[in-house]
Amino acid sequence: MAAGKSYKLQSPSGSVSVEIAVGQDVTWTVSRDGTRVLEPSAISMTLEDGSVWGQNVKVRKTAKRSVSRDLTPWVYRQSSVRESYNELTLQCSGYSMVFRAYDMGAAYRFVAARKEPFKVKEEKASFCFAGNFSAFIPYTREVKDYDSQFSTSCESQYTREPIGQWRKDKIAFLPITVEALDGMKVCITESDLLNYPGMYLSNPDGDNALEAVFPRYPKDIEQGGHNMLQGIIKSREDYLAEVSAQEAFPWRIVIVSKEDKELLTCDIPWLLGREPAPEMDFSWVKPGKVAWDWWNAWNLYGVDFEAGVNNATYKYYIDFAAKNGIEYVILDEGWAVNKKADLFQVVPEIDLPMLCEYAAGKGVGLILWAGYWAFEKDMEKACREYSEMGVKGFKVDFMDRDDQPMIQFYRRAAETAARYHLMVDFHGAFKPSGLQRTWPNVINYEGVYGLENVKGNKKYEIDLVTYEVSIPFVRLVAGPSDYTQGAMRNATRKNFRYVSSEAMSQGTRCRQLAEYVVFDAPLNMLCDSPSNYLKEQECLKFIADVPTVWDQTVALEGKAGEYVAVARRKGDTWYVGALTDWNARELTLDLSFIGGVPLMEVFRDGANAHRAARDYKHEWKEFPLDGKVSVKMAPGGGWAAVFRPEPQPWENTDKDWARYSYYEEKNKDVETRPRAVLFGDSITRNWVREDRRWLKNHNFVGRGISGQTTAQLLCRIRPDVIDLNPEYMVLLIGINDIARNNGYISVENTFGNIVSMVQLAQANGIKPVMCTLCPAREIGWRKRVGDPRPMIDKLNALISAYAKENGIPLVDYNSALRIPDGSMDPRYETDAVHPNKDGYKVMEQTLLSVLEKL
């Protein structure tokens, strides 16, 4: 094909366009809505034999394809992700260049097509801009020479300055967000980084172009660094990577947002990660929260033992976690003998088998901290033996590199841990780059200037408040972060001090709570001491209850470096979090999409939070009819709220305890006799949301209310069932009695209420259909009730026996959705209690198979 050829590619909606110019060089240009955001930028790859991909190019063949599909992640901030892009492949001699256009960005990669493995000498990836735009730049920290900058934990505050003022001797790690034309933001990152060094950016010429730089392949590595746990590079080769003949190189990504808040929910980096192997089952991966020891320096008080790295301390942490529904406890640095880099030399004060057994008996998992060198040395043995002991994962720390061998270590660690059903939390790490999609047991990454820096990092001036309203638009675009929030000691800007053993956060108490909503973190730390949390029960309950993975995430408001507000849904419950910079701020959030919630639980900055950052107000407020909620934040403040459809203790005194009003208007619209009323709680209510058409097609009416118990259904059976005069009443209820949503009730009394409703239906000429309760391994909003499976089985046995003795049809949802351990099949659940769309399909078939026989 002739030189000088130009190719064009557009995203599915046409919002993003890519132009590729091919000839003596290859350049790509990216525009959004007609505005060019990336000027022609050269790309190439130089091999060890001197050949250059991307110079004097002859395209032999082109191929286009379009993809539009819904994906179900194992672990993510959404239960469903829409993937939609157009792709162009330019096939050349020995390689291809693949370009993709999404509606919010574009990406490219090189793919080898050779017969033998080879080495990559250099790669050119330019990012050219039309002006000297400002950017959020995470420079590596000060080191003695240029090459040493590649030994980094990727923890730096942002320097916000024009790219033309880039420090010539400095490099910066990814992501970087550039403030471009017309208020647009351009975020640069990478994904599918599995066998190649990580990309950094530099600007050696001081112009409007950023250039990629990469750590060269290590030649000599010595054990050293922090407690002899790091690999120290002594010399490097003159090439970047050794790769396979068919190597698919990492994606180079340019994300373009018209509004800053679009960056908060951009899925492109995750989508460009490699899909897990189809035969892999990651249902065993259990996200959750962790009681952490290191940040609070094992600082317990009011106990009758000396706190520290010992059995008594960790049993206390385990008891604390169990009592408050916290899934994990971490044993951070100190459980293994110092400076030995040996995970099997345990200090005498720690009895790991005993602690694992003790934790398991309390329903708590243990996670072990491991230095890089020690974990690399004994990876297989450590994973095998500690998984057999009952350990649930490793927090692997102090890698502080992303050359090719280190990238390969990450992948090997993920693969090995997965074989033994272990999670991995990488600290001293680079940003997420797709591995967390390929191996969902990679549950979190650090690579962030987190709260640990308040413990005494006096070398650098610290401003975490500004940083915290910047990372959602930069670092978190790449993926989740282990920021480790949750401090109960809080300080204003003026009052902040470094106190290592009794550390404090910058900003208000409510800020710490809101960060659990704003920041993505499938494994989320509680950084403070159990002793401090136990004095702050309201805050502890909020943190313990907040989910770590979500069904839906909505970006509400945001301006990078100034403020951010996010809403997230898990099941029927919504959480909203907002943060501001050092300026007091008031936002009006449009939450009308939530709906159906009478009250909201709010944590807001107190009237004196600008002076005493711990000051906050916890209250329940009516949810406005128009859904517009005013949010006021103090300097360095935050705001958090929960919107629960199920009744809470404060609702017990409400005049409409039974929620008669919920369906009052809808009942007036029922003109024809329903074939059946499906009567129940949130499982029935969600059915309407998930498959309204199916209900309508079968003349079924849904009358479920989230959180309700048998006592409440018994109150409203007349208006919501009897007065509608259906042929059948399909009764599915009882899980919220077991959860004690309205306080204690025995299984026998729950069953008695069910029988009363059956008899009321019969007395009014309605045929009852009884249902077994769906399986559930835990009740997320009431974890303190313990394992619900024995009570579910007991209640189901009573229901089944009564139905059989009295000739009443029985729909056995439990058997249809259950796996051998009594849990709901992971294919059918959203949160251990509630079915997903596939679960409802199974329930529909099960119900119809019974009704068709009547």
Predicted regions and their residues:
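N-terminal accessory beta-strand-rich subdomains and adjacent acidic, glycine-rich linkers
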Residues: 5-273
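Oxyanion-hole/transition-state-stabilizing segment in secreted/luminal serine hydrolases
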Residues: 678, 684-703, 710-752, 774-780
